[in-house]
């Protein structure tokens, strides 16, 4: 079964709603790890709508599992990553007007630029993952830029309105996962996964890690983050929430 990366962005969302100091994402990360999180994920957005630079710097010093920094492919974010040196970076698309990441990164349309950023990060011993849709051409492009990982965008699967569409989207993810592994890429997945839909994705052969945030933080508001993380670990194993 894949490991669990807990995205704590929405702890920071609650904090930033009042521009105060709590809840602290750093404290949330500690509790998540104590409950069994295998990694901590944060997205430092260009508009700093939730996670702040301070959070990433302190998390780099305190996270005991691994820190996955999601970021846009910009010079500003590249400089921050090279300075902080997270355990790995996931390059994601980003629009200021979006509520959350809306789709996968277009590697094909900016292959030279992405390749340059991947090279600079990996030359600094920072592994790179590319958040992409499970499209054959995007997977091929990810190989060309020499990324070590991809993270398959599971949004279409998660948002499927019926079982027929859900099975179709799962088949697309399965095919993409297989293609990527055969090409030498390591495969993670995430976006929109919940306690109720995570297991079929977790069961895909070769899947290494699932990055999950909103559903865990939503559950944590009711039962606490430690229980919410433990329940997600169970769901990944097919034991339900």
Swiss-Prot record:
Which residues are responsible for catalysis?
A: 43 (proton acceptor), 70 (proton acceptor), 191 (proton donor)
The cross-references to Pfam families, in alphabetical order and at most eight, read:
PdxJ
Its GO CC terms? cytosol
Question: Kind of enzyme, top EC level?
Answer: transferase
Quick check: keyword Lyase in the entry? Answer: no
Q: In which pathway does it act?
A: Cofactor biosynthesis; pyridoxine 5'-phosphate biosynthesis; pyridoxine 5'-phosphate from D-erythrose 4-phosphate: step 5/5
Record bears the keyword RNA-binding: no
Provide the residue positions that the database annotates as binding 1-deoxy-D-xylulose 5-phosphate.
Answer: 9-10, 45, 50, 100
User: What NCBIfam families does the database record attribute to this sequence?
Assistant: pdxJ, PRK05265.1-1, PRK05265.1-3, PRK05265.1-5
Describe the subunit structure.
Homooctamer; tetramer of dimers.
Q: Which family does it belong to?
A: Belongs to the PNP synthase family.
Show the HAMAP family listed in the entry.
PdxJ (MF_00279)
What is this protein for, i.e. what is its function? Answer: Catalyzes the complicated ring closure reaction between the two acyclic compounds 1-deoxy-D-xylulose-5-phosphate (DXP) and 3-amino-2-oxopropyl phosphate (1-amino-acetone-3-phosphate or AAP) to form pyridoxine 5'-phosphate (PNP) and inorganic phosphate.
Please state what the protein is called: Pyridoxine 5'-phosphate synthase
Species in which this protein is naturally found: Nostoc punctiforme (strain ATCC 29133 / PCC 73102)
Upper taxonomic classification of the species? Bacteria, Bacillati, Cyanobacteriota, Cyanophyceae, Nostocales
């Amino acid at each position: 079964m894949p490991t669990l990366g807990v995205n704590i962005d929405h702890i920071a969302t609650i904090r930033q709603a009042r521009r105060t100091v709590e809840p602290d994402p750093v404290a949330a990360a500690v509790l998540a790890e104590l409950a069994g999180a295998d990694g901590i994920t944060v997205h430092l957005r260009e508009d700093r709508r939730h996670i702040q630079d301070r959070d990433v710097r302190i998390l780099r010093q305190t996270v005991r599992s691994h820190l996955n920094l999601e970021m846009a492919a910009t010079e500003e974010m590249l400089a921050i990553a090279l300075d902080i040196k997270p355990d790995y970076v996931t390059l994601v698309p980003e629009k200021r007007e979006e509520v959350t990441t809306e789709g996968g990164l277009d590697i094909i349309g900016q292959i030279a630029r992405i390749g340059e950023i991947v090279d600079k990060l990996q030359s600094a011993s920072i592994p790179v993952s590319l958040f992409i849709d499970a499209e054959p051409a995007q997977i091929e492009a990810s190989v060309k830029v020499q990324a070590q990982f991809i993270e398959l965008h599971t949004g279409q699967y998660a948002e499927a309105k019926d079982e027929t569409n859900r099975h179709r989207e799962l088949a697309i993810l399965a095919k993409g996962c297989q293609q990527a592994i055969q090409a030498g890429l390591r495969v993670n997945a995430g976006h929109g996964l919940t306690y109720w839909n995570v297991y079929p994705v977790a069961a895909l052969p070769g899947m290494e890690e699932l990055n999950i945030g909103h559903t865990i933080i939503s559950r944590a508001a009711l039962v606490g983050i430690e229980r919410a993380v433990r329940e997600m670990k169970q769901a990944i194993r097919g034991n339900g929430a």
